[in-house]
Amino acid sequence: MALSVASFSMASVSATQAATDMNEVTAASQSKISLEQALALANKAVKGDIISADFDQEDRNENSHYDIKIVTNNNEQEVSVNANTGKVTKGDTERLDKEDLAEYKAMKQAKVSLSQAIKKANQTLKGKVLEVEFDMDFGKPVYKVEIGKGNQIHKVVVDSMTGKITRSQVSDVDRDD
């Protein structure tokens, strides 16, 4: 009996996640500000190196925003950009720890910028970029980009040294109800 309850719970979580993803893709596609525009607005407000950005949907798109992290003077500054108005709000600032500093140094050595990685990942898809981040993937410095198009989320990994797409995966987020 416990096994079937656990299976049902996992199915509920998956269905809820799919609905959330679909709502987020829809909200992002309807937002007036793109992730690329949000990056420019955030970098105008806080000068530094953008290390990640992601779309966050709240309250039926009224408060949808982009959460952006910018490194400046070995500190990580959180910035929020309203996805409909472009209003920039500064958030918390944290000192980078050793692991984050090592990752940041790897990003600084990258031959491909975050903006170039976004363009490369979205070159053929022409969807709405939902998320981008610099990361170490199996010891290699990469950019991970999520793009929403239709009822799918495309997860693309771009090598930060060559600009080549090393991995691409599609998730269907359409609800089955």
Regions found by a protein language model. Name each.
Residues 1-177:
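Long, terminal "pre-/pro-" and other extracytoplasmic accessory regions
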